[in-house]
């Protein structure tokens, strides 16, 4: 039908643009009319360091690591756990267990008192061996197996400095889809609390886009 032909032409125009500009990527339709997904073809598979701050809450950390091990199909990665003054024995027992079974995991110790998320992550980054760093909370669980390839495709572009991913609460509502300066005051998260299926303004929530910040 006519709309199908229009979508095919729109999709092909993006492909042609990539060819003219020397960008190695494929383009595919999404379930949303007028929104297309570009997949950048990785010429190399660089080491990605996944920095995870942790203080006790070992059950959350286990779920996080297990989801990475079971669902993430990007193999060239390492885990840098930043231990932040935990007190429970089972936390340190898990660290020992993780290091024994996973050669790509390491635990470093942050000994300052008090909580400063930025300083703890920056400290962990000093021990990262990877060319790219993924900062991840210990209560995060991975949903898509190709999320690292997807993020790397954008990270490896010369005009991109930082990349974020959509995050969802357990009930399927949106936790994070970027930050917009001036929204609701100084800055805020657009679509926070909305169902993941929400269409939003012109379907923007379902498209890769530039934002003021990511977290």
Predicted feature descriptions by range:
Residues 140-186:
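Conserved donor NDP-sugar-binding/catalytic core segment of glycosyltransferases
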Residues 118-119, 126, 174, 180-215:
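A recurrent flexible, glycine/aromatic-enriched loop bordering the glycosyltransferase active site
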Residues 84, 136-139:
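Active-site acidic Asp-centered loop
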Residues 112-119, 125-128, 142-143:
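A short, glycine-/small-residue-rich helix N-cap motif at loop->alpha-helix starts
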Residues 1-12, 174-180, 184:
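Nucleotide-sugar-dependent glycosyltransferase catalytic core
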Residues 133:
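Short aromatic/hydrophobic "clamp" motif used to bind/position activated sugar donors
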Residues 15-70:
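N-proximal low-complexity "stem/linker" segments adjacent to membrane-targeting elements
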Residues 69-113:
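Acidic donor-binding segment of Leloir-type glycosyltransferases
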